[in-house]
């Protein structure tokens, strides 16, 4: 069965969600979060993706990005996986895939929807009852 086509438009914000396989932890230590964020910063510049919001939960990632080209998001997520997964596997003495299939994405065409995505992403740790206030969660753009 063929995969559904991914529609990403240049200069239009995209909400990206990537889950850990079987919802296992993708980040176990503070160093894991820092390495992922370092790769995200470097690769977003390389692939011309403006990162507006992010939240790194223990078993999944939310990003709100605006790609410079139709291929930018896919290239960003591909290279994040190519850099982060080998690091994570080496660090935690494991093998195999870390992510559950392809990342999910949703185009945020209107300003109203972009703001809703910001709120959704940055309030994720509060909804998960990990913190009382979004500024208390160190692994999101809110902090």
Model-found features: residue ranges?
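Short catalytic/metal-binding and nucleic-acid-binding patches
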Residues: 1-143
